[in-house]
């Protein structure tokens, strides 16, 4: 049987507070090139990688909106030049302007032909501590893509806060994903068990590779801890970024482990969606409203 292995990378970008979109983009393009030269076939950058995420906390900052771009647009075109050169995929998270007055926390997937082949919009927009709901609409869809090259790997994307909802990763798995990419911008309070334990749990829940990127370093009054990681379907961390700045965290993923994990613990086979729905249809927990 032909081996099904694919090399992936998470970019751990150093925060660049109050620098321009172009300056941040330049940093990310350099890291994409480094990862591509290392043979990485799917690369994920950090959440809102061309924006200062600390500015989404507190009072609404209307000066952020001019930074938003359409998808496709100038930034995705710049990334596309590299994916076309190296014949790989890049998941590029950004502040998307979908239409006048309509914005999303998005992650464009740019393919080997240099074009945008997909776009995921964050479905669980944070509304506690960081006030994303003042800026972004919630996405309404999950999708899985298949690589145009062998081993025809199937992958999907969620964004940061989405990972706290097991349904997000499980839906991707049920749609056929073997890998989940999750760009984040997680500062100190999102560390500890809220980071490693949750990230590992999503891999174990679904029996797939989970790749998490995070920024690192100070930005305004926030400090991002890095610790980007790649977790295999058995819940083993196979690569981590620690607190390194502008680092490429890469690993070779043997996709045979996906079936191995799902056969050993067949949660996807035994899931009872019809049973759960009678509870999901009831009012949500509202003690904090």
Question: Where does each model-flagged region fall?
Answer:
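Basic/polar N-terminal segments that are highly enriched at the extreme N-terminus
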Residues: 1-5, 26, 288-289
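Short beta-strand segments enriched in small/hydrophobic residues
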Residues: 2-14
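Cys-nucleophile CN-hydrolase/nitrilase-fold catalytic domain and related Cys-dependent amidase chemistry
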Residues: 18-112, 119, 186-206
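Short beta->alpha transition motifs characteristic of CBS
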Residues: 51, 55, 108, 120-126, ...
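Active-site catalytic loop in hydrolytic enzyme cores
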Residues: 68-69, 81, 98-179, 187-201, ...
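CN hydrolase (nitrilase-like) catalytic-core segments centered on the catalytic cysteine
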Residues: 71-91, 154, 160-249
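Short beta-strand scaffold segments in enzyme catalytic cores
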Residues: 92-94, 106-109, 143, 228-230, ...
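A short C-terminal boundary segment appended to hydrolase-like catalytic domains
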Residues: 256-289
């Amino acid at each position: 049987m032909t081996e099904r292995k694919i090399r992936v990378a998470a970019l751990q970008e150093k925060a660049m507070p109050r620098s321009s979109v172009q300056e941040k983009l330049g940093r990310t393009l350099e890291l994409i090139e480094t990862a591509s030269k290392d043979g990485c076939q799917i690369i994920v950058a950090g959440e809102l990688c061309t924006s200062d995420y600390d500015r989404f906390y507190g009072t609404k900052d209307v000066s952020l909106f001019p930074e938003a771009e359409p998808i496709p647009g100038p930034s995705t075109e710049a990334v596309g030049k590299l994916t076309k050169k190296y014949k790989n995929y890049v998941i590029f998270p950004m502040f998307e302007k979908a239409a006048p007055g309509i914005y999303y926390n998005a992650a464009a997937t740019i393919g080997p032909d240099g074009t945008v082949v997909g776009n995921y919009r964050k479905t669980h927009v944070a509304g506690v501590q960081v006030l994303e709901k003042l800026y972004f609409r919630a996405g309404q869809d999950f999708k899985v893509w298949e690589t145009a090259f062998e081993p025809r790997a199937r992958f999907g994307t969620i964004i940061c806060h989405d990972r706290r909802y097991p349904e997000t990763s499980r839906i991707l798995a049920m749609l056929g994903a073997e890998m989940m990419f999750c760009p984040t911008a997680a500062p100190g309070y999102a560390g500890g068990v809220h980071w490693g334990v949750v990230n590992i749990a999503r891999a174990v829940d679904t029996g797939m590779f989970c790749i998490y990127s995070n920024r690192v370093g100070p930005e305004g009054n926030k400090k991002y801890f890095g610790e980007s990681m790649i977790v295999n379907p058995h819940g083993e961390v196979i690569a981590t970024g620690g607190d390194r700045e502008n680092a490429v965290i890469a690993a070779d993923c043997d996709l045979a482990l996906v079936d191995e994990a799902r056969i050993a613990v067949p949660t996807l086979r035994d899931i009872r969606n019809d049973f759960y729905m009678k509870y999901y249809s009831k009012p949500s927990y509202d003690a904090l409203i």
